[in-house]
Amino acid sequence: MKSISPAEAARWLVHCQAYDPSGIKTGAVGDPRVKGGRGYPIGVGSLGALGGVHLEGATLRETLLLNLVPVAPGWQNGDDRDLPVWEREPQTASEESDGTRGPYGLLSLYTWQSRRVRLFGNAGDITGAMIAIGDRLDWQDRHLLEPMSVWGRSGPRERDQKRTPIYLPRPHDHSRALWRGLQTLLPAPPPPGADPPQRLSPMVVQWLARLTVTGVVGSDFRVRPRATSVTYGTQQAVVDEVFSDALTMNVLLLVEHSALRTAAVDAAADAENAVKVLRRLADNLSRAAGSRDIDSGDADRAAEQAYAELDRGFRDWLAHLGPGSDPVAERTAWQRLVRRTTLRLGYELVSATGPAAWIGRAGVDRNGREVHYSSSQAEAWFRNGLAKALPMASETSQQRQEEPA
């Protein structure tokens, strides 16, 4: 490829300012930070540290409106210095001083220049680019300004600065689906006592919840929060992984005291608890077969398969919830689905064990007690564990007849 169109170059320019990896860059003429023709790392692009969340509507217009949030009490009379970069005096190669850099509001934040970029070419073709270091952006306590990120308290900074709370953006956990961390996405009731919350949901979510409570948005409205973040590799100089996931849900789930919200968060926890029981079954079967390596990977594989099979079920169940739903009945139905899935996977694990596991062997459990590990004993523990993890999925005689032998 020798060139790209100006339109495509503009898209890559936005991407570069947002997610460019750290590392050594070309030194820009006139930048006092340059040494030996090189600009040394100042961190990733402006959005690289965020656990980004935006709301997807049915149309582009709806999506734009859902994500335009009045982020401060005095938003009607914003700071006069809050301007997009193209309405300010042209920047030089040097980093702006702390006193004038900002950001002063959403306009300057959304057009933050993490890099100094020069495109080469003409009106019809872009043939090259030079990327140099730009302005650092300290995200500490920007949760009242940046509306599209998950935030969490920073223990190390609170200890260093001897004050609380201090919030930093929290990238998403790329190792698990968004629904498994649903409680971090949805606004939560204030914690008991005077302690500030450990996590803050994105302001776009809080704002839509407020519009729902005040009746601006109807209780039958459905929205699709999409989470996006980037994982960087060695010294943040390379992109390791890009995460993107979305969930369709009714707006009542965004309201902090909503019974539907509680049911959804508890349902995600139900799945986690059931999979923990399945993991223990896999570990106990390994012990029964004579394995002394409790980290053999059997438990991880069993958990991975369980989450894969529960994934579509939870997404469909969540999207089904609405103002006419009975939270208790819906959660009961979910627990029964989880029970059926984990029971089947558990029986498959038991059936796959050989004669050595049927006979079993003596061992010591997690509490230091001597026990006899066998496939039959592991299955009994498994069924008992599921009964405790999923108490609403009560076992009936009909269910027992339908379960695999």
PLM feature segments, named:
Residues 2-4, 116:
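The −1 position to Zn-ligating cysteines in a subset of zinc-ribbon hairpins
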Residues 5-8, 120:
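Short Cys/His-rich metal-coordination motifs, predominantly Zn2+-binding knuckles/fingers
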Residues 10-13:
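Short functional micro-motifs and their immediate structural scaffolds
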Residues 15-405:
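Extended alpha-helical scaffolding segments
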